[in-house]
Structure formats: structure tokens, C-alpha cells
Amino acid sequence: MSKKIIVVGGGAAGMLAAYFAAAAGNKITLLEKNEKLGKKIYITGKGRCNLTNACDVEELFLNVKSNSKFLYSAFYGFDNSMVIDFFESHGMPVKVERGNRVFPVSDKSSDVIFALQRALKEKKVEVLLHTEVSKLCYEKITDTKADEEATDKKTELKITGVILKDGTKMDADAVIVATGGLSYPSTGSTGDGYKMAEDAGHTVTECTPSLVPFNVKEEWVKSLQGLSLKNTAISIYSGKKKLYEDFGEMLFTHFGVSGPMILSASASIKQSLIKQPLDMYIDLKPALTQEALDKRILREFEEAKNKQFKNSINKLLPAKMIPVIIELSGIDPDKKVNEISKEERNRLLMLFKKLQSGCDCCAGIDCDDGKYIGRRDHL
């Protein structure tokens, strides 16, 4: 039997929810408060939109930082290969890049949105832009199977539609809330869904940053703005307690550090574990042990023994980083390499292996509150 379903939110999740609900034979209305659909998609992946990852689906769970079991049915119900097939079948070919990252062949996130819009049109989904939902509509229902004489009859809320910001009521047999979180207010992610979920009886946890860059207090970071490092390792500590370590890519910004490895760190570090300011240690040469790196530096110094120090480490570091490392080492940049002491060389070695910086480092609906597996709130 066909149902009238309202989808709140026109991002990637909302558009896909609307498509599949319509494909099941339902009449769908998609409500989006912005002037266009997929506003956040436009800026995803630096404007290229990293759609998914082409790894084995089991690997995806390893990158879910908490409660990965909650996503088993979702991942296997519409896995990464299905995502790729969906977009290619709607006129958007994809390519797989380093790290199994999947992008549109065109490198344009707008093509992702166009493919989703074609899919919605194909299923005759009604799309209403500039339409903001203020709250859900409910009616109380009582479990009729309960003993008529019982005093603790079970009462639930049945959602019957939505109220728009202008006061208009829209009736529906079911409502799908796909508003996103509180991550990027200028794109429409203003946390509306949290209030709706809370009103529906769900537990909403405290919101804290996740998948975000880190601010770094050291001034030298600003001079490295735009520098991207690959094959680098980081370790993050709160006092003596190690909270996170990883290997991969990072990017220096005007305020600190970002990049895949840093974003993953921000998602992994629980605020409850942070008892004092964080310290991050960057290993610029993780493939080499300290002893092996020392030998490498000695070889470079031997080849450049008559050169000034500032001209001797260009094979070891990106050009933009050399002035920073020289300053932090405390070695006179004009000093001849053959005059550098073992103590000075050891200081340089430690900067390569443990470049230290201080940094400032997730929320949503609690998936452990017993209300999610198999529950749909009569939506």
C-alpha cells in the first residue's frame, strides 16, 4: 500500500532516502530549507566530493570510531559497490584514486548533485525548496493489546506530519528526518534534527567537534600554511596518556593542522579523555628508526661537509619546512656542516622524529539508548 512520506532535509542522505522510498511505490515530498539541494555536497572533498571508498566493506567498519555494529545493516543494505553502481547508472561515471577513494571522473561535486536530482525526477519526487520545518506533528496512541484493566498501558507518539516555519501543517503517513548534524550551519546543518529526535523520545548526547582540524599554539605553524605532508606519523597525548596515533597525510594551515589523519584523530579522541592540553608529536620519517635516520643524516652531512647547515638538509625535508626546522634546532644556519656537534645533530634528529606542538582538539543521537535497532517511531 502506497504511503505519503515527507523527507526533511535535501542533502545526500535525504535525497537518497527520498529516492528509495519512492522506488518502493510511495508518494514522496522532499523539504529543503535552502535555495538548492545538496548545499554541503558542493564543498565536500575540496569541491570534488569523495563519494565512498572502494575497499572491502568490512574495512569500512574499522574506520567507524564508535559503535560500528550500529551501521552493519546500513552498510550491507547499501554498500559501497551499490553506491558506485547507483551513480554510474544515473549518468555519473566514477574513478578510484589512491587509498581507494572514489570520485566523479569530472572531479566536480556538482555532478554528484545532478545525478541525485535526475534520480529524484525519475521517481517523481516532489521537491520543495525554501521550506523549513519547525517541528514534527504527533498523536498519542495506546497499545490496544494491553489488558484493559492494566494501569500501565503503553502509550507512544505516532508522527502524523510536520509543521513548517510559516505555520503550515503538512500531513504524512511517515516522516524521514535527514537534516544532518550541527557541523556546518552556513550549509543548513544547524542541528534541527537533534531537537526533532529529542521530541520523539530519543536521547541526544552533548555536541562536541568531530572530523575537524586542530588549532596549534606554536607560531611556526603559520609559516607552513599550505604544506602537505605524506607518509607522516602522529601521536597525540594528554599528559602522559597516549590518546591517538596514526600514519598518513596531514596539511598545515594558517591556524594549525588538518588533512585526513588529523580529521580522523578529532573523531577518535573522546572529550572525556582530555584532562589537560593536548600535545601532538609529528614523526617526519616514520619509515626510519632513530638509529637509521641518524645514519642518513650523517651521510647527508658527509656529502655536504663544506656547505652551510642551511644548505645541507634539502634532501631530507620539503623546502618550506627547512627554515622552521633550522630555527627550532638552534643551530646557526650559516654554520659549516663539519662544525656541527653530536649534541646539535641529536637535537635535529629529535625534531625529525618528535616534532612537538600543542593543540586543541562527537555528538549526536545516542545509538545505545535501546530505541534504534528495529524502531521507526511510527515514522
Predicted regions and their residues:
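N-terminal Rossmann-like FAD-binding beta1-loop-alpha1 element of flavoenzymes
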Residues: K3-L30
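Short hydrophobic core segments
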Residues: I6-V8, K169-S183, A197-E198, M250-T253
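Glycine-rich FAD pyrophosphate-binding loop
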Residues: A22-K46
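An anion/pyrophosphate-binding glycine-rich loop and adjacent beta-alpha core
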Residues: E35-L37, Y42-I43, L51, V57-E58, ...
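Glycine-rich active-site loop/strand segments that organize a redox cofactor
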Residues: R48-V96
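Short beta-strand to alpha-helix junction loop
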Residues: L71-S81, G99-R118, L128, Y184-G188, ...
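A glycine-rich dinucleotide-binding beta-alpha-beta segment and adjacent secondary-structure elements
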Residues: L128-H130, P323-L379
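A conserved short coil-to-beta-strand element within the FAD-binding core of flavoproteins
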Residues: L129-D147, D152-K158
